[in-house]
Amino acid sequence: MHAWPASEVPALPGEGRDLRIHDTATGGVIPLHPGPVARIYVCGITPYDATHMGHAATYNAFDLVQRVWLDTKRQVHYVQNVTDVDDPLLERAERDGVDWVGLAEKETALFREDMTALRMLPPQHYIGAVEAIPGIVPLVERLRDAGAAYELDGDVYFSVEADPHFGKVSNLDAAAMRLLSAERGGDPDRPGKKNPLDPMLWMAAREGEPSWDGASLGRGRPGWHIECVAIALDHLGMGFDVQGGGSDLAFPHHEMGASHAQALTGEFPMAKAYVHAGMVALNGEKMSKSKGNLVFVSKLRRDGVDPAAIRLALLAHHYRSDWEWTDAVLEEALARLGTWRAAVSRPDGPPAEALVEEIRDALANDLDAPAALAAVDRWAALQHERGGTDEGAPGVVSRAVDALLGVAL
């Protein structure tokens, strides 16, 4: 599966900053010190109802991670999956009377268009769950043969008790885990499971549903969590720098993934930092496909909204915060974009070297994009109030905002 085209990232003068970021597993902001190649895995979409503003906010956060790393002259190895077979996708295709493969392809193509418009840097590896199945099957067999998984009526479940570190990613108690498991695709009440929290690794073929050859597992399809583990281990290996996604992925998805990886490799954790973006609400409720209260990037683009303004609306909120999309949020972003563009359109302006360092410092401090925006606001206000004589300043600001914030002025 191919990703989307990359926009050029301008090189900036001076030195980039090492990133400090909030790690869900430890509950604190930790320093990250990647090697020459920083490694990041971000969980991708289930391709229906793409791309809503919650999606966009999540991928914006991890785009900033990449930009901070690139500014330190590191290379970035970024992997993202597409959950292109899953119960919600199949249910949506059946509801709409369309082929599930066609639906997935259409929505994935739309997602790529939205990511391109928003100038999100693409992954080097963009992997669909379906194409990963040949690599998933032997992992499930290994877990079963090692006693870390068991069969139940043809399905294969992972035993959470096989991982002594289970629970150390989300830090939730058993009651909270059970509740979230039921809400987020698990089946804690299924009779016969060794532990209600045990997640499915391999679903035996069901009538009327797609299935694939599972060798000794029989025909079926993989569970959600093992898909990401297989893709991440194949392309990044253990101990990569960041695993990212929305805060609703901390449990069960990232917790279970870490357990699968530990049982397969004997190593923990799978990622050095588990980083989670906040939820975006509309009319007081979390924006979600199940509720249908969605604001789509593609709809805004069709309505003529500049994608740079959409990106500024996302950047105005700290990535870990929960926030609400409103008309006022977009109006503020449009006004900011106009102010910034007018400021950099002049032939000269106030010196900008200190501004570049302010943006770097803000982003290195747990991706504090609102502080970075405030710094640019101050420079733009000074430009409009008094101007300046530095002929290179507007260009420096444009390149810094492009390279570090992904906004083209």
Swiss-Prot record:
Zn(2+) binds at residues 43, 228, 253. It is an enzyme of class 6 (ligase). Belongs to the class-I aminoacyl-tRNA synthetase family. MshC subfamily. Its cofactor is Zn(2+). PANTHER family: CYSTEINE--TRNA LIGASE, CYTOPLASMIC, CYSTEINYL-TRNA SYNTHETASE. The gene is mshC. A motif ('KMSKS' region) lies at residues 286-290. Keywords: ATP-binding, Ligase, Metal-binding, Nucleotide-binding, Zinc. Catalyzes the ATP-dependent condensation of GlcN-Ins and L-cysteine to form L-Cys-GlcN-Ins. A motif ('ERGGDP' region) lies at residues 183-188. Monomer. It comes from Streptomyces avermitilis (strain ATCC 31267 / DSM 46492 / JCM 5070 / NBRC 14893 / NCIMB 12804 / NRRL 8165 / MA-4680). One of its GO terms (biological process) is cysteinyl-tRNA aminoacylation. This is L-cysteine:1D-myo-inositol 2-amino-2-deoxy-alpha-D-glucopyranoside ligase. It comes from the Bacteria. The keyword Ligase applies. The keyword Ligase applies. Its EC number is 6.3.1.13. GO terms for cellular component: cytosol. Pfam families: tRNA-synt_1e (PF01406). A motif ('HIGH' region) lies at residues 45-55. Binds 1 zinc ion per subunit. It catalyses: 1D-myo-inositol 2-amino-2-deoxy-alpha-D-glucopyranoside + L-cysteine + ATP = 1D-myo-inositol 2-(L-cysteinylamino)-2-deoxy-alpha-D-glucopyranoside + AMP + diphosphate + H(+). L-cysteinyl-5'-AMP binds at residues 43-46, 58, 81-83, 224, 246-248, 280. GO terms for molecular function: ATP binding; cysteine-glucosaminylinositol ligase activity; cysteine-tRNA ligase activity; zinc ion binding.
